[in-house]
């Protein structure tokens, strides 16, 4: 029998699901021992649906927050997210695939942990270590990091 090389997978440290769990985000961040300053990545729709509420929960919990509204998951939007991630301790990707992929990739590029808050169950990449970013008009699957936590209300 031939020995095959071992494979490993990095998984989220915490997965929290259920009604009302968004209110628990400050406690989740404390349990994960993440420092205070955050950047939330969302689009205009998810900002209205849950983003403003998440920002309020986090700021009330002692986490100063910045936000960035994105239009798509392109290299240009990734650069926008990364330019706002200076002096940030964690990223939050809130929404469907595009905001989560941008937060995931920015976290990988800048070595910043990110929390995934999916708002659509139809997106399957909310816990993966790959990000789909549009480059030169084509989607490209890029190596990234999985979220430190997934929080799904």
Enumerate the predicted regions with their spans.
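ATP/NTP phosphate-donor binding region
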Residues: 1-90
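A glycine/threonine-rich phosphate-anchoring loop and its flanking beta-alpha core
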Residues: 13, 108-153
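Glycine-centered flexibility sites
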Residues: 18, 26, 95-97, 125
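Basic, gly/Ser/Thr/Pro-rich low-complexity segments located predominantly at protein N termini
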Residues: 23, 100-102, 130
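Short beta-strand/turn micro-motifs composed of small residues
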Residues: 41-42, 95, 152
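Short glycine-/acidic-enriched loop or helix-start segments at secondary-structure transitions
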Residues: 50-52, 102-104, 126-127
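Residue-level detector of flexible, active-site-proximal loop/helix-junction positions
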Residues: 72-74, 98, 121
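A short, small-residue-rich loop immediately preceding and capping a beta-strand
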Residues: 85-119
């Amino acid at each position: 029998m031939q020995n095959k090389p071992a494979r490993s997978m990095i998984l989220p440290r915490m997965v929290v699901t259920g009604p009302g769990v968004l209110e628990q985000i400050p406690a989740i961040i404390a349990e994960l021992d993440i420092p205070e300053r955050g950047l939330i990545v969302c689009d205009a729709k998810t900002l209205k649906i849950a983003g403003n509420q998440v920002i309020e929960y986090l700021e009330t919990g002692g986490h100063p927050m910045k936000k960035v509204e994105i239009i798509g998951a392109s290299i240009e939007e990734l650069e926008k997210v990364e330019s706002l991630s200076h002096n940030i301790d964690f990223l939050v990707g809130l929404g469907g695939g595009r905001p989560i992929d941008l937060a995931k990739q920015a976290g990988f590029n800048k070595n910043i942990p990110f929390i995934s808050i999916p708002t659509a169950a139809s997106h399957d990449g909310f816990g993966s270590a790959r990000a789909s970013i549009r480059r030169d008009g084509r989607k490209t699957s890029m190596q990234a990091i999985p979220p430190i936590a997934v929080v799904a209300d």
